[in-house]
Regions:
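Amphipathic, interaction-prone secondary-structure segments
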Residues: 16-47
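Compositionally biased, low-structure terminal segments
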Residues: 7, 13-15, 41, 46, ...
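Mixed-charge, Lys/Arg-enriched low-complexity segments
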Residues: 1-4, 52-85
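Negatively charged, low-complexity tracts enriched in Asp/Glu with abundant Ser/Thr
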Residues: 1-23
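Short, surface-exposed, charged/polar-biased interaction segments
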Residues: 8, 33, 37, 77-81
Length: 85
């Protein structure tokens, strides 16, 4: 599903917890989130990792430009660039 925003935080949590990866743009910066074995990494495209080995809750609480992921992932402030396994 390309470019489709998440309707609820629960949908987003389920999506990540089942092993899917995400590309998104927030405030003009492209980020990636990848999960493996209940551990998550966050990176900036073409710049490298900014967080490694996070739990799901730590991922949701990770701040992007001062705002927690959980507070903007379902809003129109974020553009979902890709979703894939």
């Amino acid at each position: 599903v390309y470019g489709e925003k998440f309707e609820t935080l629960g949908e987003f949590k389920f999506y990540l917890s089942t092993g899917w990866n995400l590309g998104m743009q927030y405030k003009g910066v492209e980020y990636g989130i990848e999960g493996h074995n209940n551990s998550f990494d966050i990176w900036i495209y073409n710049k490298g990792d900014i967080a490694n080995g996070l739990t799901l809750e730590e991922t949701l609480d990770f701040e992007f430009d001062g705002v927690k992921l959980r507070d903007f992932i379902t809003t129109d402030d974020v553009e979902i660039l890709e979703r894939h396994l």
